[in-house]
Amino acid sequence: IYIDPPYGIKYGSNFQPFINRKPNQTIDKEEDLTAEPEMIRAFRDTWELGTHSYLAYLRDRLLLSRELLHSSGSIFVQISDENLHLVRCLLDEVFGARNFMSIIAYRTKIPLGTKYLASIYDYIVWFAKDKECVKFRKLYDDRKSGEGTQFNKVRLPSLREVPFKDFDDSLENLPVGASVFRATDLVSSGLTESCVFEFALDGKVYKPKSGKSWKTNSSGMARAIRARRVLHGKAMPSYRFELSDFPVQEYANVWTSTQGATDKGYVVETSDRVIERCLLMTTDPGDLVLDPTCGGGTTAYVAEKWGRRWITCDTSRVAIT
């Protein structure tokens, strides 16, 4: 389930949700609608009783979502930093704090000069129906190389090491047989007795400090030395980790590549790639996806694109079905 509710209570709207209306009370008559199409704001964000109305609205949808979720299912609630803390508490109440999975921060804009700190991230609060049996698939992104990253050195076929910037930080400019790498620590953060030993590299003897050990045993270290992967350091040796060894890395809970997307149809529409990652992490082809806050239909579009079944709905009176 992917929910993209209104972010807060501060924006104006043509339609006001009332939570204390009396039976048969008529509100929002058709004749009250403005004649100017641009004044009809479908994506409303205003509440009669302020935060109380907002949380009551969201809690109703979360309670229903909990009943609809499969035991291996997940729910993602998109929100800004204004009400992130309130939404997290609400999800704790409805789904149980034990089923909290993560808060994902994804970049939406570039800082444009604000009085205080610019807010350039929105958030997705992820909960499982049951964390013990939640469906999850790790996603990977290409590792970055060049200036500003750890992969900033090149080993030439002649075994000489030069900065990657000498090749304009472009893999296409590298000569055949060259490799991009970074130096990583050979000392483990803990202590493993079988990995405590001395070894010699070009006549220099190395031994881990007291209470520490190497990240591999003696036979593993010997293989690394034969492969010319062990490098001299000022005090301790390091390991030459080449970009080609594992050219991808797992996505964590901070997504920076979501800013600047050109697939938006209106200002508050969620980028395809944000919903795409959530779906690919937690569903398989043929699984059913629900979005009770359909809006522009981005969730349905992404679900259809990746072979998921989908249901969407919208409470706006100007929604088109």
Listing of model-derived features with the role each one plays in the protein:
Residues T299-R308:
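Conserved SAM-binding loop of SAM-dependent methyltransferases across substrates and taxa
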Residues W310-D314:
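Conserved SAM-binding motif I beta-strand of class I
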Residues I1-L288, I320:
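Class I S-adenosyl-L-methionine
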Residues T293-G297:
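Class I SAM-dependent methyltransferase "Motif I" SAM/SAH-binding loop
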